[in-house]
């Protein structure tokens, strides 16, 4: 999913990209929306949310997401300078 950018270019910005032996979680932003992409062996999830906070909250209910990957993804996201907990 690419988001429109002035001048006809599409820009997707990675806010967080967490990888463990159990899978991967990415938070992407552009066009005023946040995309949550999570995947692991035998499963995958993609959803779009109005805010980063909504996407982070929704991560808790992604089916088959291992607890350790969930915790690491949130920890990585909170360490990002653009995340202030109220996005």
Q: Where do the model's predicted regions map?
A:
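Mixed-charge, Lys/Arg-enriched low-complexity segments
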Residues: 2-8, 41-87
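Short, well-ordered helical secondary-structure segments
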Residues: 12-14, 21-23, 37-39, 52, ...
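Short N-terminal "domain-start" leader segments
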Residues: 2-31
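A short, structured beta-strand/loop element
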Residues: 24-50
